[in-house]
Regions:
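The canonical Cys-X-X-Cys-His
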Residues: 57-68
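N-terminal secretory signal peptides that target proteins for export/translocation
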Residues: 1-10
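Acidic, divalent-cation-chelating loop motifs in proteins
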Residues: 106-114
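Sec-dependent N-terminal signal peptides
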Residues: 12-20
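Short cysteine/histidine-rich zinc-coordinating motifs and their immediately flanking basic loops
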Residues: 72-82
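Sequence context of c-type cytochrome heme-c attachment sites
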Residues: 29-56, 80-107
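Proline-centered structural pivot motif
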Residues: 102, 106, 122-165
Length: 167
């Protein structure tokens, strides 16, 4: 008689179960940390990539961290953000990441000391915490393009809707 033996059916069943498990686990394995996801949206890096949440090339962990896997230690840009959180807390605020990130960019700092302010590096899609990652356009040209695109204000956090606001 045709068909699979009991062992063959068992192997197929186990194989199908493993395939389903891999498919269900993939989104979790590919998920990005919340801060990185927020920064990608805030920097508009998601605009041209509908699958940005699954594409780690959109913003690597090394944007803020020394190690490719994230965690401590932080690079100079990541340290600037950490300092921003501390300053925010010392001022009695409950800093949300988008607000602290925007404050760091508005400060017009150059965390990695490469001659390009952090906000310009965000605009040019280079790494603001890595002095070896620099925009390929001259500073003046980059500044003009940045200003034409809206300057640092383009990275302002989206206004939060308040349930206490009156119409």
């Amino acid at each position: 008689m045709g068909g699979l033996s009991a062992d063959g059916r068992r192997v197929r069943l186990v194989g199908a179960g493993l395939a389903a498990l891999v498919l269900l686990a993939a989104p979790v394995a590919l998920a990005m940390p919340r801060y990185r996801s927020q920064a990608i949206v805030q920097f508009h890096y998601d605009a041209d990539n509908p699958l940005w949440e699954l594409d780690r090339r959109v913003m690597a962990c090394t944007y803020c961290h020394v190690d490719v896997g994230g965690g401590a230690p932080w690079n100079p840009f990541g340290e600037a953000i950490r300092v921003g959180f501390r300053a925010d807390a010392e001022a009695g605020q409950k800093g949300k990441f988008p607000d602290v990130l925007y404050a760091v960019l508005k400060a017009d700092g150059d965390a990695d000391g490469d001659g390009f302010p952090d906000a310009l590096e965000v605009f040019a899609r280079t790494l603001p915490g890595d002095p070896d990652s620099r925009p390929d356009r001259p500073l003046a040209e980059l500044q003009a393009g940045f200003a034409a695109a809206g300057g640092v204000a383009q990275y302002a956090p989206k206004a939060q809707k308040s349930s206490n606001s009156t119409p």
